[in-house]
Amino acid sequence: TDLNTLFDGAGKVAAGTMTADELAALEDTACPTCGSCSGMYTANSMNCLTETIGMSLPGSGTIPAVMSARLRLAKEAGERVMDLLKEDIKPSDIITEKAIENAMRTDMAIGCSTNTILHLTAIAHAAGHDIDLARLDAYGRKTPQICKLNPASSVFITDLNDVGGIPAVMKELAKGGMIIPIA
């Protein structure tokens, strides 16, 4: 059961067209595993954009919490953090203006939560970059939406993972000159 069905169920109980027991049955299947829900809500949106910025490893935005790949990625992330310390690479070296722009364009391409605009502008500000709404509007007008995930469709974050995740999205955006891949 996706969250939209659950939200609708709550309204149906209030309207008297569904029983509380029926709603409870929906609740029991809404988010059946650990991790976030499978829709493109704030948690998954920011996870994908954190990957785009470069503050998490490729694949981290879409690998489900219950997969072995997530455990392997966690180990790899720990190793990478130690390398970054040795290399004296700081978040300010990673969160560049171009990385923020890439994240904003990726946001538009995959239809992230509207909350991401608040988070991305705050991240940009903290990193010393000035991103205003006019610039965001320009990105939105020029960046194609290349996929729609739940709640905008019946496609879930796990489906995006199955077709290559954020690296695949970024590759498509780079083909169109929408982003510049950052090593």
Question: How does the language model describe each region?
Answer:
Residues 1-183:
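Catalytic or ion-coupling anion/metal-binding cores of large enzyme and transporter domains
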